From Swiss-Prot:
Naturally occurring in which organism (per UniProt): Saccharomyces cerevisiae (strain ATCC 204508 / S288c) (Baker's yeast)
Family under the similarity heading: Belongs to the putative lipase ROG1 family.
Region (Disordered): 502-523
Name of protein: Putative lipase YDL109C
Bias kind Basic and acidic residues: ranges: 513-523
GO function term, MF aspect, one: monoacylglycerol lipase activity
Taxonomy of the source species: Eukaryota, Fungi, Dikarya, Ascomycota, Saccharomycotina
Catalytic residues (positions): 274 (charge relay system)
Length: 647
């Protein structure tokens, strides 16, 4: 044993807490020896780390106050998901569901003789429903497993109740959420900024749920020496996602204009997950209408959505979900996703978002990419996240019979293949289309009712997806240690243009809104109309991925290891959009469409009266929450009398 290092010694101890969307990172550095010569008495005894959720056990059933759960992982600093791990001691370890009073213990192995070891410990709040509550925890580092059982008395006057009993050679650097999201200092202060906006989905947040994506994009900075990547997200929409797309989009737009935009911003990209795809769409439309100078000064680069319900979820969900959406169980947002006419006249909001004069701003983007889950996503159906039109026959071949549910019509049509995607040049010149007869077969199948057994399976899929947010099925050890053993994730990657679409039926555009009492077919046709409007004059890159459950959160790697099935998707996103210049990113027809003036009865001027649904300042009562937010508010009222939960 190294001199000066006694048996069963606590080397570091700290107590802290995290609220919704917060995480803390502890960078543990251990100097095994210094200098060029290796000491004769050196030992390779492991260090140990313990993380304990110190929240009172009585808070465990108070789900709408929290839940009071932590995610935590321990990994070597030099761990890379693309490297093969030979030694089992180098494998990362994690706990995705650390409940109140539970503890997580990990070994920090010293299995090689080298001067320095560095480990990273991440501790992330799993709170979903309340901004005020917190999860308390303690972290202990000891020189033996037995040392973690020792009782430690802390000096409450120290910041964060830190009891740093540091041993010579050990240092621990604590990083907060703000530290982790801090923009790296630029090498060249004269560089223009490429602003990358990340937007979270329903009952989610940016700071914790999209942290992995943020760090992976920053790694691409070395491939962009002429610009400075600045990755940001609007944090104040957390716990507000039931209030509607307009509420969320206006908040995001004002955040971009008021807090992020300045003369140093030269480019902008948008990346939205789930509901975030619609939120960023509204924000783009709002900025284009209310601040027309913005997109003249700032070049739009990437519009990316991941598992986003761009067409809503009106015709693919179980009946009990449709009824819940219509009744406002999940607030204004649910009604909008159900294509229900609401506060904006006789048209659903998603239809208004596809107006040609507003969608035209998307044509200015250099790239437009949709990532969609083929299976295992019970929240957002494939047809909605991919804007409906796909080569479904090719997908069926790639899936080998897998479906989201036995009644899913997306894998029943006979569609003529559009072609493979061997390289970009082939895609750019692809003129094939979707066979109209086969498309009718697909669309007709979408109307068919499922049998009772299939309905039960579909319902279970929705419930399972909601449950998997916190109890996500985790990859096995081989997934983390051997990249070659991982199953291919990208099963379809293709550019689609308006000319690829089959011709619409003669009656498709007879009426544009689904009114009370009208048939499900009307809403189905509304989805097709919206999808066609999104394709007007633009090309879309559609990437369909095959992920294991929970695919909806795996696609963004909500948590680094428990959602690791999504690593290849994030790698693809970063490589395709931030590490190389795509020669077909801006086809000429897109540029021409973007440069056309939209004549709106006043000589090309777009007065706000034409977009009152977009720019009108709404009464706060319009943005009503659902049952979850209402219950959470009641819970907040209760906890105000129990300060130990929030102090």
């Amino acid at each position: 044993m190294e001199a000066g290092r006694s048996a069963d010694e606590v080397l570091y101890h700290n107590q802290s807490s995290v609220k919704l969307g917060e995480l803390e990172r502890y960078v543990i550095t251990y100097e095994l020896y210094q200098g060029d010569s290796i000491p004769a008495d050196i030992t390779l005894d492991s260090l140990w780390v313990k993380i304990k959720n110190t929240t009172k056990l009585s808070y465990k059933p108070a789900y709408l106050l929290g839940p009071f759960i932590l995610y935590c992982d321990v990994r070597a600093k030099d761990y890379e998901s693309s490297y093969k791990i030979i030694c089992s001691a180098d494998k990362p370890v994690f706990q995705s569901n650390l409940q109140a009073q539970q503890k997580f213990i990990a070994e920090l192995s010293l299995h090689h003789i080298k001067p320095r070891y560095v480990w990273i410990v991440d501790i992330v709040s799993q709170i979903l429903f309340n901004k005020e509550t917190k999860v308390t925890f303690e972290i202990v580092v000891g020189n033996s497993k037995a040392s973690l059982k020792r009782k430690i008395r802390c000096n409450d006057s120290l910041p964060d109740k830190a009891c740093n009993i540091l041993h010579t050679g050990l240092s621990v650097h604590r990083l907060t959420t703000a530290d982790i999201w801090k923009v790296p200092r630029p090498i060249d202060m004269s560089q223009k900024s490429h602003l990358v906006i990340l937007t979270h989905g329903f009952q989610s947040n940016v700071s914790a749920d999209m942290e992995y994506l943020m760090e992976e994009i920053y790694k691409a900075q070395m491939n962009n020496p002429n610009e400075r990547l600045v990755i940001k997200g609007y944090m104040k929409n957390a716990c507000e996602t039931e209030k509607g797309i307009k509420f969320l989009g206006v908040g995001l737009a004002n955040y971009i204009i008021d807090e992020l935009y300045d003369d140093s911003v030269g480019k902008i990209s948008f990346i939205g997950h789930s509901l975030g795809g619609l939120t960023q769409t509204f924000a783009i439309c709002y900025i284009k209408t209310k601040y027309p100078y913005f997109f003249k000064k700032v070049e739009p680069i990437n519009f990316i959505s991941l598992a986003s319900p761009l067409l809503g979820i009106a015709t693919s969900t179980p009946n009990y979900v449709k009824m819940s959406l219509s009744m406002g169980i999940i607030g204004t947002t649910g009604q909008e996703l159900g294509l229900k006419d609401g506060n904006y006249g006789d048209k659903p909001l998603l239809y208004l978002l596809s107006e040609e004069s507003l969608i035209s701003v998307l044509a200015r983007f250099k790239r437009r990419t949709l990532y969609a889950n083929a299976v295992n996503d019970g929240i957002v159906p494939l047809y909605s996240s991919s804007l409906l039109f796909l080569d479904y026959s090719q997908l069926l071949q790639k899936l080998g019979g897998q479906t989201t549910a036995p009644c899913d019509p997306l894998f029943q049509p006979e569609v003529s293949p559009i072609g493979e995607l061997p390289n970009h040049s082939d895609v750019a010149n692809d003129d094939d289309g979707i066979n109209a007869s086969s498309w009718n077969t697909f669309w007709k199948s979408k109307e068919n009712n499922c049998d009772k057994k299939s309905k039960r399976l579909m319902n279970a899929s929705v419930i399972k997806s909601m449950k998997s947010v916190l109890l996500s099925p985790c990859p096995d050890a081989k997934f983390f240690s051997d990249p070659d053993a991982r199953v291919a994730t990208i099963i379809h990657d293709k550019i689609y243009t308006e000319k690829n679409l089959p011709p619409p039926s003669p009656t498709l555009y007879e009426g544009t809104a689904a009114k009370e009492g009208e048939t499900r077919k009307t809403r189905k046709e509304m989805e097709e109309i919206i999808a066609r409007r999104w394709h007007k004059g633009m090309h879309w890159r559609k990437v369909v991925v095959l992920l294991k459950p929970d695919a909806h959160n795996n696609i963004i790697v909500r948590r680094r290891f428990s959602n690791a099935y999504g690593w290849p998707v994030v790698d693809h996103l970063v490589t395709a959009h931030f590490q190389r210049d795509d020669p077909i990113a801006s086809p000429m027809q897109d540029k021409q469409f973007a440069e056309e003036d939209i004549n709106m009865a006043t000589g090309g001027v777009e007065p706000n009266k034409f977009y009152s649904w977009l720019t009108k300042i709404e009464d706060p009562s319009v943005y009503h929450g659902g049952i979850v937010s209402t219950a959470s508010q009641l819970a907040s009222s209760w906890i105000s009398k129990h300060s130990s939960v929030t102090d």
